[in-house]
Design a protein with these regions (language model features):
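Glycine-rich oxoanion-binding loops at beta->alpha junctions
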Residues: 70-100, 112
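Glycine-rich, charge-decorated loop segments at or immediately adjacent to ligand/cofactor-binding or catalytic sites
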Residues: 62-65, 136-158
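Glycine/threonine-rich flexible loop motifs
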Residues: 109-121
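Conserved functional hotspot residues or short segments at active or partner-binding sites
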Residues: 255-377
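Conserved anion/nucleotide-ligand pocket segment
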Residues: 158-232
């Protein structure tokens, strides 16, 4: 295990940046220090915190996926936690920011553009720039490494909560690097400071460090789930297929009541995809799609994560289900998810899967999975070059 110190574990650097400032804190579930103390509590005890802001899952991760997150009083600090994630906004208002000098952002990310916290970070940077406030990002390790770039790339016209800023599906950046990338490439003009991680290298996964895994969101229960999420999240855009939410193996179990699990597993095994096996499985989700119904499908078993391709595996699995059961496939419409950046009344894409893929050609049948990956090859290479300028780690 490699010893690693996230930004929150470096008091001397934090003191240089935060002492004497009125702080607004944005944090969430899983953001703890090495002593398992939530970052919000560390900051409140050490500095003058005058505002707490919550995003998708609450400042302590106490809300579930898709649940409305209101403003509320935090039981530990006694402070009001102001909601900055609702149908109107994903950043503090000018009035909220008037009570702070610096916004401190410390949130676990998932290494994918689907994870809404990235886009919250960018929106908060823009709000700080407009209000003349500083922003300090306490960086954390990239949980599935900072090397492999996968999937499709957002076009310049795409501005959604699951895709923006020319990002690839698997971003291969830390949150601090992402903030630097957005600030530099998109001219945000935020007075930005990143307190880097110490001891982490780009090729390292979370479970190769000495850091404890606490849930960054309710369904990401470990490094493997996070790696699977980087691809299997696309099934959130398929109304009729469960991605395993409501089970103990989200993103590892994929299925539906009408699927023949043995046949699907056999077809996927025949594809010879590297680093992964497929086992036929039965499961019954307690919530989400097909709740209370017995589903058949596959359990996706990562055997070699260096060889495993998250996005390719997921899109070819969807290809296979689509080939087997063309009449059963139905797409979620644009109202799925909780997107405030691109409301349904102003869609670039009409289907939620189009947003997750950053491309409408797949659902319309213009390309299959391999064709979609090939279509975005040049864009992935360009993204990889652009982001490298903002790397903080070797």
């Amino acid at each position: 295990m490699q010893q690693v110190w996230n930004g929150i574990d470096q008091p001397e650097q934090m003191d240089r940046e935060l002492k004497g400032q009125r702080l607004g804190v944005v944090s969430g579930g899983g953001a703890v220090d090495k002593n398992l103390c939530p970052a919000v509590d560390v900051l409140c005890r050490r500095y003058q915190v005058t505002a707490l802001f919550n995003t998708i899952y609450g400042i302590r991760g106490e809300f579930m996926y898709g649940e409305r997150v209101p403003s509320y009083v935090d039981r530990v600090t006694g402070m009001e936690v102001e909601s900055i994630f609702n149908r109107e906004r994903i950043a503090p208002t000018p009035e909220m920011l008037s009570r702070v000098d610096t916004v401190v952002f410390d949130i676990r990310e998932a290494g994918t553009r689907f994870f809404e916290y990235l886009h919250c970070c960018a929106a908060i940077m823009k709000a700080c720039a407009a209000a003349g406030k500083r922003m300090v990002v306490l960086d954390r390790v990239a949980p599935i490494g900072g090397v492999a770039v996968e999937g499709t790339v957002c076009p310049p016209t795409m501005h959604t909560i699951v895709g923006d800023y020319g990002l690839a599906s698997r971003t291969a950046m830390t949150m601090g690097e992402f903030a630097r990338y957005v600030n530099g490439e998109y001219g945000v003009g935020c007075d930005l400071t990143v307190i880097p991680v110490q001891g982490w290298r780009r090729e390292m996964y979370f479970d190769q460090t000495d850091l404890p895994w606490l849930l960054p969101s309710p369904s990401l229960n470990g490094t493997t789930a996070n790696l699977l999420y980087a691809g299997m999240c696309i099934f959130e855009g398929v109304r009729t297929v469960s991605e395993g939410r409501g089970t103990s193996k989200p993103f590892e179990l994929i299925g539906a009541p009408w699927i023949d699990g043995r046949e699907l597993a056999a077809r996927m095994t025949a594809r010879g995809l590297p680093g992964v096996d497929f086992a036929p499985v039965y499961f019954k989700p307690a919530s989400s799609k097909h709740a209370g119904q017995v589903c058949q499908g596959v359990q996706v078993l990562v055997r070699d994560r260096q060889a495993y391709a998250s996005f390719r595996t997921a899109i070819l699995l969807l290809d296979t289900i689509r080939e087997m059961y063309p009449e059963q496939i139905a797409w979620e419409d644009n109202s799925a998810g909780h997107d405030v950046l691109q409301p349904p009344s102003q869609p670039l894409f009409t289907r939620y899967l189009d947003k997750l893929l950053a491309d409408a050609d797949y659902t319309s049948g213009v390309v299959d999975g391999e064709g979609l990956i090939a279509k975005h090859a040049a864009a992935r290479q360009n993204y990889t070059r652009r982001k490298a300028k903002y790397h903080l780690y070797d």
